[in-house]
Amino acid sequence: MNKPTTISFHVPPKMWSEFQESMLKSRMFNEEVIGFFFCQRHQVSKRKIRYIPKTWVVPSPDCYEHQSATGLVLTQPFHSFLLENYLRVGLDVVHIHTHAGRGMPDFSYIDDRYESEYAQFISSGFPQKPRLISGVFDEDFQSCQFRMWDRKGRKFEKVQFCNSLFEVATNENDMNNPDLMFARQKIFGEANQRLLNELKVALIGCGGIGSIFAELLGRLGVKNWVLVDPDRLETLNLNRMPGATQEMVEQRWHKVHYVKHLIKRIYSEGSCVKTIPTSIESELARQEIATCDLIVVATDNHFSRKMAQEIALEYMRPLVCLGTHIDMKQDHTPRMYCRVSVPPMGGGWCLMCGNIISLQRAAFESAPAEIHQMVGSVGYIEGVNDPAVFWLNSICASTGVGVIHGMVSGFLNVDSGIDWVYEFPGSDWRKTNTEYLRSDDCFFCC
């Protein structure tokens, strides 16, 4: 018997908080209110479909022709505005409304009749045949039900609603069979450990930082990976990649296969590691990254980080960016930095508008080979690779894993994003005030 298709509607926490606040403010007394999300459909797998919100709208009181505790009707001009600006461009729509009272709400007979007719109307009125998802909440927005109608308005399917960072289904059977390996991590809660075990992580860049990161996050409990890196191991990598050997170099191992080897040493069974020995530009890499719950980029160039950020924005996935830098002052003393950045999921700022990566450098790196060689010395010493040491990479990777542990366990709030820079030998952590990174006109995230 075939498994049923799982349909989910996933809203980032910050976006949901803003939407919920706007809905509650739009209610004057105890009348019903309605809000709209306009979504992109993402076919994650054969049996999993995810609807990703691109924008939301909550009508103001003057947008209603009628509004009471028993129902509501939008004005025709406002409804036409929604149709022309969002459905005609190919987005699907989610209607969210409230019912009076507390506790699990039910769809009413009026809901059934209206939604059935509306699902048929929008699918027949637009070339892209948009789908209707509807959700009903109690008056406090604590309990809800969601469903998606077919295009004829005759049947509907249940939709799972998620407003957390990670949309991960955990195996309830694991509750009764805790893994002894993680006994020393019980303090963080068994539910959080199960979430780590089920989390699917895309790691872009399996070099000096990425390999250490994979070892650390793997030992924390992450077993499901997509590894992306086109490079092979070289002798100059051996000073900073744990477990890498000269024999691997001579056998021309791809870095993704080396990192898979690290993970499989931790989990001889029960892990799933997909290796993609290509650049992030490949369509295969892009498709696989989009299926992951978390994207981590640990590359040494700006172009791949820009690509990772674009994928994270398009598919509404949390992104963690890791990097280090070493240079020499005029008195020949070193300055060493590591940086951990997590842009807010759903917009606000990104790696580009936050100036965490350089679009100019990204353009240089994506240019034809002859131009790339000509400008490659900008910021580099020609003929010499970027300086890198194991211990600095380890600080960066360890902090990145700590941040992810906090995101999963809930003891670190990243709704507004974080940007942390560590400086050595001053041993100083500088935490950027992310309010200064916010942008209202970024080409990428606004």
Show the residue positions of the predicted features.
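Glycine-rich adenosine-cofactor-binding loop
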Residues: 189-232
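A short, basic/flexible loop-to-alpha-helix module at the beginning of a structural domain
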Residues: 171-201
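Glycine-rich phosphate/adenylate-binding loop
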Residues: 124-125, 138-151, 167-172, 195, ...
